[in-house]
Amino acid sequence: MPETKNIEKQEQEQEAINPLKIVFKKPYVFEGKTYNKIDLSGLEDMTGEDLIRIEKALRMTGVKSLNFEMTPEGAFMYAAQAAGVPVEFFDLLPIAEARKIRIVVINFLWS
């Protein structure tokens, strides 16, 4: 048990150091693979072309917004590209984790 608490503490410290690496409270299973965290550091490498492509895709799905990244769909499209996972990854993610990811994306794009 002490080892588990130590690992959790290390993960929390890592999250504080790099807010783009989000550690989940509980393991999340997607398409048979278990995830304990998601790394959104890929946001730092995205370009204006990515922004245009994502916003066009969102318009095509019927999402209407002046700030697409503020919508869950938009934030998850940015997160999916950054993390290298399909956007469907976020569909069944627990709501607390989903909101955390959305906030991280918004904060990154608006900072």
Predicted features, each with a name:
Residues 2-111:
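Short, surface-exposed, charged amphipathic helix/loop patches that serve as local interaction elements
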